[in-house]
Amino acid sequence: MDVDDDAIDIMLENARSLGVEGKVVPMCEEITNVGNIEADLVLCNPPWGKQKHGADSKFIKSIKNLCLPTYLLHSSSARHVEAEFLRSGWQVQKLLTLPFDLGAVYPHHTRRRMSTDATLWRLTPPWLSAPDRS
């Protein structure tokens, strides 16, 4: 799911090269406009909110409402991601941290390119991470 048609095209090209195109359903849509969907997994790279505090909050809320396993790429300096999901009973795993190159795409970007650290989180909803009590 993405609001950028070019990103959807790249995702489809990558899925084809990996031989999984039949398992990927692209959606060109804002995550906040999506109700219940049938999916195995959500991949999310929201605005990080460095320029505008809370820019990611609607994405975090939508992920929690979808209640599906999610991989979330977010700024490594964001401390609220882990706490927000743990507070809601989700299982949270920090998978890796890596440099993330950014081109100047927004008016507030003053440099042509920069790099920042990003963390990839695996977020598992409570219904999947609850212990078996049978």
Spell out what each predicted region is:
Residues 1-134:
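Class I S-adenosyl-L-methionine-dependent methyltransferase catalytic core
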